[in-house]
Amino acid sequence: MEITDNIITKSKNIKLKEEKGKIMRKKSIWIAISLIVVLGLLIGTVGCPSPTPTTTAPTTTAAAEVTILYHCPWPPGIILSNNEINWMDKVEERTGGRVKFERIFGGTLSNLENQAVSIKDGVFDCGQTSYVYNPGLYPLGTVTTLPTIEDDTAVWAHATHEMIETTPELQAEFAALNQHYLFTWALEPMEMYSFVKVQTLEDFQGLKIRVHGGAALAAAKLGWIGVSVPWEEIAVASANHVIDAACVPCPITGRDAGLHTIYPYYVTPFPIYQFHFATVMNINKWNSIPADLQAIITECSAEAVDDALAYLDRELEKGYQDLRDAGVEWIDWPAAEMDKFRAQAGEPCWVDWVVQMNEQGLPGQKILDRFLELCAKYKASSD
């Protein structure tokens, strides 16, 4: 037993010495490493100058900049593009250049009829759409383009803008197309250019008349021959006498298209209906814009309604003079004929519209009543 115990004791002593040896070796290694590090620091301190102390400024994020791809189906320099150009210029200026529009004109990416879907699909971010060219996409919105719904363009523009801004059903039509509504801008009322000296409703019978929107509804009621001609083709169709008369906004928009050099007669005052344009933005693009910039864009959009009306006022007399210079003859549309038009093709079309909306499960009467209420509101404030 003593021999065994001695062997065990010696074995333990040997292991203990081995452990101590390992510990000593580890300490030696760490000491060596520490000396090397200290030596390196000393050399660096002697060999390199000390950096100049600096004060660290608070961390700031650069102001966000947004580029919006805008597309217009028309060339620049005419009413169909200038209203949006004026709005974009104002947005860029008021945001201090933080919002910039990349501008494409001339229908490179879409014609007017396809603008709504192109914006929906994100082909471009922003541009104009129209209830008249896309009635199936904005059925309730077409209340604003019914014949004789409102003769006063300023009243109509403000009522239409507020209608869209405050009516969930109309907002839903834009939302369904991935669009954020910005503003409505007005043209002159839709009147008539003609190759024939018309002075009564009966004089239009048998004529091929370019119509759309509210004018198409009225033509159907009156038994006129309505012809669909897109704006891009109207000058050629007129010059070639494919049509005998054209329901268009005459003194500015029609002048810009050169129609005053083609038609000999301008029938006025004959406000058949008001054409609708809205400027909208793809909702995903809108949601990507910082809130402070959204607020400025919204502010400029609200002002754009009046800016467009001011543009009309500035250009109207120039347009009239251009018509005179081209030798266009004014036909003074009799008030009695206008009254007949309202009775036969105005309110009867409103009734039909309500029925059509109801058949689609839409609140036609509610929307009609609301729009008439807003027109009355703005008419009263303008008196």
Predicted regions and their residues:
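Short, low-complexity disordered leader/linker segments with a strong preference
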Residues: 1-67, 380-383
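N-terminal secretory/targeting leader peptides
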Residues: 48-51, 62-157, 165, 169-383
